[in-house]
């Protein structure tokens, strides 16, 4: 619907028709727009939604009557306003220019506008097309999603605007490079944990700054232990075993020794669990505490375990000496073989 199309009173509609038939377009005289110099309207006028549009028509002293029309609706005839829309105002009505302004332009104002003049000889018209640009707006976007590793996902981002905006998807991650999709839809087949994080949808059409919204993608996967650190501690000292695991959701930790679970509250022992790390602390190590401990990390998708040693200072020396002895034997083996060959 054009400017004022919904505001006419019945009597004004009748006057509009009469004006057009009687003095703007006399009987038997066709409306023309072929004169290269008179009347002359502007080229196409482009404005953003909410701004004001000025429509100018160049005339001269041959004009006896003049009017601005939106399609078949008269907005102004001379100094008289035939449109009740308060946004439409007369800017100038002189011997050289006839101009109106449409304030707070909206998309329904877009379309053709006609400057129609009457001279002593015949009527003439000139047209200008009003183009209304609209800033981009994201009207629909996927919600945050949680999905198991290996499954497929589809993200949607629908945007409106004039001209039609360009939609792009980008993975917000230090490892991500450039855009992952230049479309409203982002499809990821067999998603991996490295593809988790935030995905940014951007809509742009050069009318205003791009609009941006984000979707958080959580990729669930079973635990894996990235570090299992044993320690050597003398009797009577404090010792700590550490178990670090990566998992989504975060892993739950348990400690075992000889198939027996160690629980919080045991005298002299403390279990400290964090989202990705568990510590087993002995405040006063005894000979009985030495040995092999098992760290178990689990979540709803699976579990894993690792063996961690708590040993005394002497055990470190024995391990190193044992390694050296094995290396020495390997080094001597070729000499023994050569000696036997020469002997026989």
Swiss-Prot record:
InterPro entries: Ig-like_dom, Ig-like_dom_sf, Ig-like_fold, Ig_I-set, Ig_sub, Ig_sub2, IgLON_domain, Immunoglobulin_dom. Residues 39-126, 136-218, 222-309 form the Ig-like C2-type domain. A lipid is attached at residue 321 (GPI-anchor amidated asparagine). Glycans are attached at residues 44, 70, 152, 284, 292, 305, 321. Disulfide bonds join 57-115, 157-201, 243-295. Residues 322-344 form a propeptide. One of its GO terms (biological process) is cell adhesion. Gene3D superfamilies: Immunoglobulins. One of its GO terms (cellular component) is plasma membrane. The keyword Signal applies. The keyword Membrane applies. Residues 1-33 form the signal peptide. Keywords: Cell adhesion, Cell membrane, Disulfide bond, Glycoprotein, GPI-anchor, Immunoglobulin domain, Lipoprotein, Membrane, Repeat, Signal. Pfam families: I-set, ig, Ig_3. Coiled coil: none annotated. It is found in: Cell membrane. Its main location: membrane. It comes from the Eukaryota. It is a lipid-anchor; GPI-anchor. Belongs to the immunoglobulin superfamily. IgLON family. Neural cell adhesion molecule. This is Neurotrimin. The lineage of its organism: Eukaryota, Metazoa, Chordata, Craniata, Vertebrata. The gene is Ntm.
């Amino acid at each position: 619907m054009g400017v004022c199309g919904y505001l006419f009173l019945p009597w004004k509609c009748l006057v509009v028709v009469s004006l057009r038939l009687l003095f703007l377009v006399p009987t038997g005289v066709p409306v023309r727009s072929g004169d290269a110099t008179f009347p002359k309207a502007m080229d196409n006028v482009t404005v953003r939604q909410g701004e004001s549009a000025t429509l100018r028509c160049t005339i001269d002293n041959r004009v006896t009557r003049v009017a601005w029309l939106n399609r078949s609706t008269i907005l102004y005839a001379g100094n008289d306003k035939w449109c009740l829309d308060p946004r439409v105002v007369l800017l100038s009505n002189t011997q050289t220019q006839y101009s109106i302004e449409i304030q707070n332009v909206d998309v329904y104002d877009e379309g053709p506008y006609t400057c129609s003049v009457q001279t002593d000889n015949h009527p003439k018209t000139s047209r200008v097309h009003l183009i209304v640009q609209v800033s981009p707006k994201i009207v629909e976007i996927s919600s945050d999603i949680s999905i198991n590793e290996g499954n497929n996902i589809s993200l949607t981002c629908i945007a409106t605007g004039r001209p039609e905006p360009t939609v792009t998807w980008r993975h917000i991650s230090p490892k991500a490079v450039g855009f992952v999709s230049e479309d409203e839809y982002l499809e990821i087949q067999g998603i991996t944990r490295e593809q988790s994080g935030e995905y940014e949808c951007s809509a742009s059409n050069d009318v205003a700054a791009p609009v941006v919204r984000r979707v958080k993608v959580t990729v669930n996967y079973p635990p894996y232990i990235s570090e299992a650190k044993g320690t050597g501690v003398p009797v009577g000292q404090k010792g700590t075993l550490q178990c670090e695991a990566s998992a989504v959701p975060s892993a739950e930790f348990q400690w075992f020794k000889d198939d027996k679970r160690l629980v919080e509250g045991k005298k002299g022992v403390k279990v400290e669990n964090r989202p990705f790390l568990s510590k087993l602390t002995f405040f006063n190590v005894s000979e009985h505490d030495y040995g092999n401990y098992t760290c178990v990390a689990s979540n709803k998708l699976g579990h894993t375990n690792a063996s961690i040693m708590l040993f005394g200072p002497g055990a470190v020396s024995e391990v190193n000496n044992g390694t050296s002895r094995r290396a020495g034997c390997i080094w001597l083996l070729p000499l023994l073989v050569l000696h036997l060959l020469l002997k026989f």
